């Protein structure tokens, strides 16, 4: 299974099953322990999503891509799976906020507190028009967090929303800016 997959945390043994899915590790490899102590319970109407980055990523064979985790970022993508027809659809809602948690050793909790809404044009679609399911992301600026395999990324979203993510790696080549 691809490393860059979303993870929905479930209590009990589901946490460990979810970690196995997301980490994509070989069975003999170590699995990082998910420690959510110090995080408050999600507010009513919110659902908790957790990403536990793996510290055992394969090195890139591309010499132009940095192999150092300090040069990596994780993009958080909030969205919803919707049915698409001939109309243009967009997801609307508040942006993500970050709250530092001193009781959790300075870790952060990311939240989208209000519900997401699908806005759409209202054209009459042809009955022959195919309908498909697709993921709509919240139309905001990309939200990046530093890559740290020691700490989980904890995000509380409105029920019905989904969290996806992808890993970004910097180039090794640093370019000089123009001085004016």
Curated annotation (Swiss-Prot):
One of its GO terms (molecular function) is serine-type endopeptidase inhibitor activity. Pfam families: Ecotin (PF03974). Residues 1-30 form the signal peptide. SUPFAM superfamilies: Ecotin, trypsin inhibitor. Keywords: Signal. It comes from the Bacteria. Belongs to the protease inhibitor I11 (ecotin) family. This is Putative ecotin-like protein. It comes from Synechococcus sp. (strain WH7805).
């Amino acid at each position: 299974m691809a490393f860059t997959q979303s993870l929905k945390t479930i209590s009990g043994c589901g946490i460990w099953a979810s970690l196995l899915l997301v980490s994509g590790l070989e069975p003999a490899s170590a699995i990082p322990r998910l420690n959510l102590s110090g995080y408050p319970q999600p507010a009513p109407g919110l659902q908790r999503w957790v990403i536990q980055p793996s510290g055992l990523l394969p090195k890139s064979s591309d010499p132009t891509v940095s192999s150092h985790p300090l040069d990596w970022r994780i993009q958080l993508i909030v969205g919803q799976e919707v049915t698409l027809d001939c109309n243009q659809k967009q997801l609307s809602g508040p942006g993500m906020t970050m709250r530092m948690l001193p009781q959790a050793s300075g870790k952060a909790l990311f939240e989208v507190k209000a519900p997401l809404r699908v806005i759409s044009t209202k054209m009459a679609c042809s009955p022959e028009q195919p309908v498909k399911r697709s993921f709509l992301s919240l139309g905001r600026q990309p939200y990046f967090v530093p890559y740290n395999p020691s700490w989980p990324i904890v995000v509380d979203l409105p029920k019905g929303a989904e969290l996806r993510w992808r890993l970004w790696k910097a180039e090794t080549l640093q370019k000089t800016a123009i001085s004016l």
